[in-house]
Amino acid sequence: MDFEYLPFNLVTFFIFLFFVFLLIYGRRKSKRTXKINLPPGPWKLPILGNLHNMMMGSSPHHIFRDLSRKYGDLMLIKLGEFNTIVASSPRMAKEVLKTHDLSFLNRPIIQATKILCYDNSALVFSQYGDSWRQMRKIFVLELLSTKRVRSFQPIRQDEGSRLVSLIKESVGKSIDLSEKIKLYTTSMVARAAFGKVNDAGVTFLKLVTEAAEVAEGFDPADMFPSYKFLNVFFNSRSNLLKIHGKTDMILEEMIDEHIKSHQMGKKANGENGEEDVIDILLSIKDSGDLGISHWMNNVKALIFDMFSAGTETSSATVEWAMTELMKNPSVMRKAQDEVRQAFKGKKTIDESDLEELKYLKLVVKEVLRLHPFAPLLVPRECREACQIDGYDIPVKTRVFVNVWAIGRDEKYWKDPESFIPERFEDNSLDFTGNNFEYLPFGCGRRICPGMTFGLANVHLVLALLLYHFNWKLPPGVNDIDMAERPGLGASKKHGLVLVPSFYQPSF
């Protein structure tokens, strides 16, 4: 069993067990609770609940899928002190995300997001209420609206050209394509947010990646919040505070730099004279429309949101797309033929022409069916008690929707484990959350606000990689590694190493 990515190894786990049992049985008296009708689920250990199930060596979405086959599409598990339900079918997803959406609009309070996201003031992890509504309005209408995403097109084109040039330097050699893709996304997001790529921005992105890796695990301090000593024992809080201190300093400097620039009359700080995210937020503040208190922390939290969501998700999707295309050469040929036919005679791809690439978009849809970046979506928490299928769901119950399992369920998908983009031809399935068998970005009020921004990056980068290069496996490698990185995400465990050869289009 590989414990590399678990929050504790076997030795510390058993020490942890000893202290928890000692404290629980030494300090707590048994409490009588009214009997309620909870969903079915696997048997639970005293105190620990179903944590033993999470030690099975697989990622949570795999474990939950396997358990739900036995206990049903609405399953109850207990992770430490918290009851958690897992919805694993389109019908149950609809119950949680639409029928009872107002009951499940809150997020669980975990210390990683509380520390890193300025007391959960970022949009993704903030609690439902007036502040969240105002933040969402700013994010959706100002920062990442369709019009605003289009305004970032010159940045995407510029960084896309740099990506192509970078890969051309290594033609005929084995390269870690994953690293090249991440370089594009980090540079793109840095320029969109800060106006430029500099050492501070690169450092910030590394810290965001480090923070994401910490947050992806199950932290014992979050599962047993009553026992503060766990923060000392596992040192997680200390590590998070160190990361936050560094990211906060960088954001403070970037915002101060923009404030001074605005005071001097320069309202757009992008490399090509365009407004960046900080410029936009400062303009909203100056107009008096921000409508939120502690605006500096909210601005920082919004930027942190954008970086954490915009870099990892886009790069992971392109990585999986190239992985699946290498594993399915007939699909690769069809996608490349479409791109090269559509742009025949052009030295490079202009983003405005991507609408012609119908098959490429089917490929991306199929990638997100098999490899949604958030396979359990972002967890929710019940804020108003409700009933689903006759089962009682108490307040504070945590909720996962296993969209990864739903996307691979043979009840709803023919040959679900195969990569077949054509399955999306001539049907109404899209990313907007109206079809509950396909929810890579969630749905409703809590749908991913950066969906349009992320897809714009994915479509352009994938088109560039297919147009300008042919790809093969390195010498001695006969198969593609499909392993996922353990945790709450579903990115590739190992980088995608390929050998590019430059394709010279005929003019």
UniProtKB/Swiss-Prot annotation:
It comes from the Eukaryota. The chain crosses the membrane at residues 6-26, 447-467. Keywords: Heme, Iron, Membrane, Metal-binding, Monooxygenase, Oxidoreductase, Transmembrane, Transmembrane helix. InterPro entries: CYP450_71D, Cyt_P450, Cyt_P450_CS, Cyt_P450_E_grp-I, Cyt_P450_sf. It is a multi-pass membrane protein. Heme binds at C448. Coiled coil: none annotated. It holds the Pfam family p450. Belongs to the cytochrome P450 family. This is Cytochrome P450 71D2. The lineage of its organism: Eukaryota, Viridiplantae, Streptophyta, Embryophyta, Tracheophyta. The gene is CYP71D2.
